Amino acid sequence: MHIRLLCYGVITLVVKVTSIFHDWPKYLPNSPKKQISVMPEHATLLSLDVGWEANNVKSQNLLSHVTALLDQAGVADGAFHHAHSGTHLLRHTTTTDLNATIYRPLLCLILQGAKQVGSSTRTLTVGAGQSLIVSHTLPVISRITEASSEVPYTALVFPLDLDLLRSLAPAVPPVISGPSSDPFSIGQCDTDPGLEDALYRFFVQCEEEETRQLLAPITSREIHARLLIGQQAKVLQRLLWHESAASRIFLATRHIQANLSETIVVGDLAARIGLSNSAFFEQFKAVTGTSPLQYQKDLRLLKARDDLRTSRAKVSEVAFAVGYESSAQFSREYSRKFGRSPRQDRELEPIN
């Protein structure tokens, strides 16, 4: 009986409260006679429009912030290392010729314009609103394909923390269950609005010492987590899956980088990561877009170019330091790759 009375009382209360909310306008002074209308049928379309606008605002916020940072740094054309965030910001007002460089594990957001990037066997074109994710250290060829003074090519490069990715991986649902049909270590996708928002917050947090120390690391963790569950999660999960070709080749590339001046013995390197010579060569090319020997040669030449522009060592000393036994061979291969002799390159400004 008591329970029945209690239930009756609750139902009565709910009915009264509902009635009050339904008639709420008449309790307000000078309230309009018009009642609240039922949600129209086009509300779903309206919500989609609002969502698109919100995503567009996030993109514009990030572009405006990066542009302001470049302006403050006085960089009208070129690259800028933003020390507080650890990122690199880029702006170009004209298209560029092909340029050889090294990509390390990174996220690159194209905010305006477009660029082309690739290896000797693969080429990708990525434009505004898209991102590149690079899982391995790679020698690449790139060029800016869309840029003008009115709409300059603008991008940001966010370096990836592989240790942080590995710590997050166990909590992430796997999107792969075996080797991928395309293990290439550069992935391309549309930029996720949530990722743009996190990057914008990261930049803002890096402006003040207190938020840079307390909040920015948390947001950096969020950015890495979003990459593991986003559109290009496969690129990074392949790297973190220890039985994948990407993971094994990562070990091989790391060995080559650490022993750059030493001669590569393919059989020894293949055995080090548990592959036959033929499987190693095939998987290495699939992941990096080049052969082991060409990979080492490209890294040697790029390292030599940096050394020439940042030190006063003789050309022959630079050549021997990166593993060349012949200064003449070094000069020939250097000129073939960069279109300039080592001595000519020494006169140029350091590359950012």
What residues fall within each predicted segment?
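N-terminal amphipathic/hydrophobic targeting modules at extreme N-termini
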Residues: 10-25, 37
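A short, N-terminal "cap"/entry segment at the start of jelly-roll beta-barrel domains
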Residues: 31-83, 96-97, 179-183, 205
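Short alpha-helical segment immediately N-terminal to, or the first helix within
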Residues: 255-259, 306-310
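Amphipathic alpha-helical segments enriched in hydrophobic/aromatic residues interleaved with Lys/Arg
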Residues: 48-61, 165-222, 226, 252-254
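N-terminal regulatory/effector-sensing and dimerization cores
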Residues: 23, 79-177
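Intrinsic-disorder-associated, low-complexity terminal segments enriched in Asp/Asn/His/Tyr and depleted
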Residues: 2, 23, 27-30
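Basic/polar phosphate-binding segments, predominantly the helix-turn-helix DNA-binding elements
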Residues: 222, 226-232, 239-241, 257-259, ...
